[in-house]
């Protein structure tokens, strides 16, 4: 082969390197007039579609909507606070920090389960909740520069992923079976109106076990205002169908075309038919119309929001109705009256119906608008105009059509009240008027009898129980009682369900004790999966246990961990009284492996903490108490002493007498104890390990495990010594010896005492996981079927599965508890169950864990070569707007299908152990004739050039970077090293695909024989 000629160090790729960063050796300038023009070439922020460009465009426009990348980034930012204020701000009391914690570990089912447990319309609320005035309102991160968490976006993301899984809801089988419930659970229950509040109420009643629950809906579609009045670009009908399907999974029935006041259908008629409890969730069905608009019709150019928004929804929400409705054609100038959320839905919908200009007019000032910022910001971005301090005076018509609107000016007094100045009025030209001045019960009030209404026109109820003050069997919620947001309506239904339950049981002589409500959680077949595992005769209810570390500092802490669901615990290492220790402080510090990252989710910790300061007698007593109170949990005693047969024998016998299930020999503490001839001092020598294991084997019949140090050349040799000495298994690994960092004055942290001295400590956490995975797999390959307890960065179900695949049976956990609290185990449990369940469904086998496969999208060839910035983005928008004019808005993209049954048995945890081992081996066994190259998805690329830079300065100069479009192009020089993919900030933007040509390495110079 012929290599380079001339100097081999000469730079040859001048063209490719043209845009590669170089060090500036002097300041530069560009005239302002030039830079002003240039910046437009790269603009992204102000180039979204707006105004008339939005005609027929009902795609999601919410700025809160997240991709998986965004969700993982945002969830990692969450502090997961104690007594979290976000939960207090949520009407449904969602455990927000828990579901966000699950998202951060890629356990999207766990997140969805948490959400749907408290909010059966969790996806709807994730999409439309005014979080800025609810959960986000109290976010502690609002006190920082980066601002509050995007809670709504995270909720939407997790529940949408669960929707794609297509898994049915079932009733928790741990509850009393339906066949064994008393007759009171067969009571007939009616709900009127199939909107959010009724769906919520019916779902909880179904979970409680009521089997005769019927919803009566006036329309031929379901969902109430979620379907008819919230636009598709905020909430599509697929979401409504999905949540109703989950409700129907519990046996709830729905009857269509049942309109109050028609054909004798009333609240009282239902009671006469034997319905023992009735829930009214009909909203406020009629608009409030200003007398100025009396006798005006849509043909003349006037709409109420109650008329306009349903017309838009029927024409734009695929699957909502079978009719072939057309969008209202508002070709001209539109005035929207009102300043609530509904008014802004009307305003942004008007653009999609062809409006050339939309003006939102309202009586108050900007600071007193009722609409939430989420709605106002979208309208502002889409170029709606705003006209505050005005009140309708009269409509101007010409030839029977609206042509203008006259307004009075209003003023705000010092007392905060608004007044009308009739001396000031003006005219605004328009072609259409949409009134969004609120709604009222109207003519159906009589059909709601015996329900009565208060002076505000809302139902007269007890707001603590949602019970009518005039009929104990009648309950109400949602708009009807003045709670106008979707999430408040959902919570009304939830509250009513419990009180309906209490009422019905009392009717049948079964009083429900006072105390906190106990509504059943969301439950699916995933939750039935068995994740128990047996190792060395010990039956672990789940593979998650506390490592012998800070979370096991005391018996009371282990007790609390068991109460939260942990399967086992290893005690903090204890010694004989003659070897008692006293710790220094400070002794546990955050890692530096994740850069300057503060707060949650630390990638590593370093500690110089010694073994337990408590006596061996304390721990032996504690073990007995824990086994007495938690007989199904595994308790393993961790012991340590020097190389002394009598001491090891005594400690082993004490541990056995305490009632422990097993013993762990701490032969690996990397700091402090080694200086005393213990821990690391014993565990680095195969001969010492062999003899210690022999002594312990002779002293006890309990299974015992040697805890191994990674601070050796080859850990499998230490494992072999333990095996040969009689140990039943090993724990791999203990912490890695390290020095975490130095300050600018050369002092390390932790620095002890006035002299600021330090020592090498043990590094733990995710930073050690690659070392731990290597250790576990190496031991497994060397000692097939030898029991292994893994530890070292097991911070999720996802990480746990990796350890199982490498040969471990259970995992010990410390750092993730230090990062959060004991409740994280529930995230790991649901995550592991989900992983196993998904392997039983053929349609889910292509998922990467809980990450859905990339959707196959037919890419528009017209968009090729057009990045999403500057003039190229404007051109993309033009093409998209043009093609939207002919789009079939009623074509269902993702039709709802029945949940498939498993096609294979759900595998056991044991089936996962060792799965990766056959594919881990020698470098010489790797195929050199099966090469790959990088493929960049232009549509996903954000044009950052990270791939280009790393390939230039750390790779093979194989990527070109267009100076105008910033689109990267992989050339034939690509060697498939994968570095570009590793630094790419967008998941799946770069993939490695088979190389189509034979790979010929560049040897630099001609190969010499």
Curated annotation (Swiss-Prot):
Source organism of the structure: Dictyostelium discoideum
Binding residues for FMN: 548, 572-573, 707, 765, 791-793, 814-815
Cofactor binding description: Binds 4 [4Fe-4S] clusters. Contains approximately 16 iron atoms per subunit.
Record-annotated active site: 669
Binding site for NADP(+): 339-342, 363-364, 370, 436-438, 479-484
Cofactor(s) it depends on: [4Fe-4S] cluster; FAD; FMN
UniProt keywords, alphabetically: 4Fe-4S, Cytoplasm, FAD, Flavoprotein, FMN, Iron, Iron-sulfur, Metal-binding, NADP, Nucleotide-binding, Oxidoreductase, Repeat
Residues bound to [4Fe-4S] cluster 1: 78, 81, 86, 139
PANTHER family linked to this entry: DIHYDROPYRIMIDINE DEHYDROGENASE [NADP(+)] (PTHR43073:SF2)
Binding site for FAD: 128, 193-197, 217-225, 234, 260, 478-486
Residue numbers binding [4Fe-4S] cluster 2: 90, 129, 135, 155
Binding site for substrate: 607, 666-668, 734-735
Family label: Belongs to the dihydropyrimidine dehydrogenase family.
Name this polypeptide is given: Dihydropyrimidine dehydrogenase [NADP(+)]
Lineage of source species: Eukaryota, Amoebozoa, Evosea, Eumycetozoa, Dictyostelia
InterPro entries in the record: 4Fe4S_Fe-S-bd, 4Fe4S_Fe_S_CS, Aldolase_TIM, Dihydroorotate_DH_cat, DPD_II, FAD/NAD-bd_sf, FAD/NAD-binding_dom, Helical_ferredxn
Pathway the protein takes part in: Amino-acid biosynthesis; beta-alanine biosynthesis
UniProt GO cellular component terms: cytoplasm; cytosol
GO MF term (any one): NADP binding
Gene: pyd1
E.C. numbers: 1.3.1.2
């Amino acid at each position: 082969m012929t290599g380079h000629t001339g100097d081999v160090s000469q730079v040859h790729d001048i063209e490719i390197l043209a845009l590669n960063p170089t060090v500036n050796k002097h300041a530069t300038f560009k005239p302002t007039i030039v830079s002003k023009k240039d910046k437009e070439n790269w603009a992204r922020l102000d180039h979204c579609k707006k105004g008339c460009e939005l005609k027929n465009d009902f795609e999601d426009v919410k700025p809160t909507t997240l991709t998986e990348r965004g969700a993982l980034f945002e969830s990692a930012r969450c502090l997961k606070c104690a007594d979290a204020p976000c939960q207090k701000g949520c009407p449904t009391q969602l455990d927000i920090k828990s579901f966000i914690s699950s998202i951060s570990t890629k356990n999207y089912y766990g997140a969805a389960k948490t959400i749907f447990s408290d909010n059966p319309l969790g996806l709807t609320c994730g999409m439309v909740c005014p979080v800025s005035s609810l959960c986000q309102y109290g976010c502690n991160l609002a006190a920082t520069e980066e601002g509050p968490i995007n809670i709504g976006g995270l909720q939407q993301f997790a529940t949408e992923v669960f929707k794609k899984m297509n898994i049915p809801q079932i009733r928790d089988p741990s509850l009393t079976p339906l066949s064994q419930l008393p007759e009171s659970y067969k009571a007939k229950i009616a709900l009127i109106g199939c909107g959010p509040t009724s769906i919520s109420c019916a779902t909880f009643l179904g979970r409680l076990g009521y089997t005769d629950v019927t919803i009566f809906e006036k329309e031929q579609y379901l969902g109430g205002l979620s379907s008819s009045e919230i636009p598709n670009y905020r909430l599509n009908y697929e979401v409504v169908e999905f949540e109703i399907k989950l409700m129907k999974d519990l046996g709830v029935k729905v009857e269509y075309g049942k309109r109050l006041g028609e054909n004798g259908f009333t609240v009282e008629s239902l009671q006469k038919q034997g319905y023992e409890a009735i829930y009214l969730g009909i909203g406020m069905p009629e608009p409030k119309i200003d007398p100025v608009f009396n006798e005006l019709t849509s043909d003349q150019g006037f709409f109420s929001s109650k008329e306009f928004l349903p017309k838009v929804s029927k024409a734009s929400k695929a699957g909502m109705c079978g009719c072939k409705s057309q969008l209202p054609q508002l070709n001209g100038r539109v005035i929207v009256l009102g300043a609530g959320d509904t008014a802004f839905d009307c305003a942004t919908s008007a653009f999609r119906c062809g409006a050339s200009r939309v003006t939102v007019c309202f009586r108050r000032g900007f600071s007193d608008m009722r609409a939430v910022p989420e709605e106002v910001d979208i309208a502002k971005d889409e170029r709606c105009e705003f006209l505050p301090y005005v009140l309708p005076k009269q409509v101007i018509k010409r030839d029977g059509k609206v042509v203008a609107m006259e307004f009075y000016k209003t003023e705000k007094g010092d007392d905060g009240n608004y007044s009308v100045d009739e001396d000031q009025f003006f005219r605004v030209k328009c072609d259409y008027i949409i009134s969004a001045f609120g709604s009222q019960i109207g003519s159906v009030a009589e059909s709601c009898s015996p329900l009565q209404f208060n002076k505000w026109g809302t139902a007269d109820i007890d707001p603590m129980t949602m019970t009518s003050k005039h009929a104990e069997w009648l309950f109400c919620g949602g708009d009807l009682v003045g709670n106008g947001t979707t999430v408040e309506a959902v919570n009304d239904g939830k509250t009513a369900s419990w009180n309906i339950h209490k009422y019905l049981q009392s009717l049948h002589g079964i009083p429900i004790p006072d105390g906190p409500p106990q509504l059943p959680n969301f439950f699916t077949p995933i939750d039935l999966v068995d994740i128990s595992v047996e190792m060395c005769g010990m039956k672990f209810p789940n593979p998650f246990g506390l490592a012998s570390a800070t979370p096991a500092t005391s018996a009371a802490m282990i007790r609390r961990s068991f109460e939260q669901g942990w399967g086992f615990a290893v005690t903090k290492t204890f010694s004989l009284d003659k070897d008692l220790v006293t710790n220094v402080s400070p002794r546990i510090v955050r890692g530096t492996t994740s850069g300057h990252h503060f707060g949650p989710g630390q990638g590593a910790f370093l500690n110089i903490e010694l073994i337990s300061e408590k006596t061996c007698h304390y721990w032996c007593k504690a073990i007995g108490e824990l086994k007495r109170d938690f007989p199904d949990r595994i308790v393993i005693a961790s012991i340590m002493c020097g190389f002394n047969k009598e001491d090891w024998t005594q400690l082993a016998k004490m541990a056995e007498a305490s009632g422990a299930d097993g013993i762990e020999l701490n032969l690996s503490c990397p700091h402090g104890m080694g200086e005393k001839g213990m821990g690391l001092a014993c565990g680095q020598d195969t001969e010492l390990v062999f003899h210690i294991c022999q002594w312990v084997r002779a002293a006890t019949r309990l299974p015992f495990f040697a805890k191994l140090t990674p601070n050796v050349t080859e850990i499998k040799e230490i494992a072999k010594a333990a095996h040969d000495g009689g140990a039943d298994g090993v724990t791999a690994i203990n912490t890695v010896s390290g020095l975490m960092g130095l300050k600018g004055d050369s002092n390390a942290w932790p620095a002890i005492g006035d002299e600021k001295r330090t020592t090498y400590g043990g590094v733990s956490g995710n930073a050690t996981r690659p070392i731990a995975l290597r250790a576990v797999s190496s031991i497994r390959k060397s000692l097939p079927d030898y029991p292994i307890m893994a530890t070292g960065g097991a911070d999720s179900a996802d990480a746990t599965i990796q350890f199982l695949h490498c040969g471990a049976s259970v995992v010990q956990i410390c750092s993730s508890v230090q990062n959060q609290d004991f409740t994280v185990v529930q995230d790991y449990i649901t995550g592991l169950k989900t992983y196993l369940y998904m392997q039983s469904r053929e349609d889910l086998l292509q998922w990467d864990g809980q990450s859905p496969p990339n959707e196959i999208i037919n890419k528009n060839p017209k968009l090729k070569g057009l990045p999403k910035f500057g003039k190229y983005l404007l051109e993309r928008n033009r093409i998209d707007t043009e093609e939207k004019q002919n789009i079939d808005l009623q074509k269902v993209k993702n039709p709802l299908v029945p949940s498939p049954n498993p096609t294979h048995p759900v595998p056991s945890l044991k089936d996962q152990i060792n799965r990766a081992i056959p594919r881990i081996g020698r470098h010489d066994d790797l195929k050199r004739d099966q090469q790959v190259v990088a493929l960049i998805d232009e549509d996903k690329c954000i044009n950052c050039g990270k791939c280009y830079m790393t390939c230039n300065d750390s790779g093979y100069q194989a990527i070109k970077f267009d100076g105008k479009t910033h689109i990267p192009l992989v050339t034939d020089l690509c060697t498939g090293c994968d570095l570009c993919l590793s630094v790419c900030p967008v998941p799946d933007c770069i993939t490695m695909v088979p190389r189509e040509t034979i790979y010929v390495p560049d040897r630099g110079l001609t190969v010499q024989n």
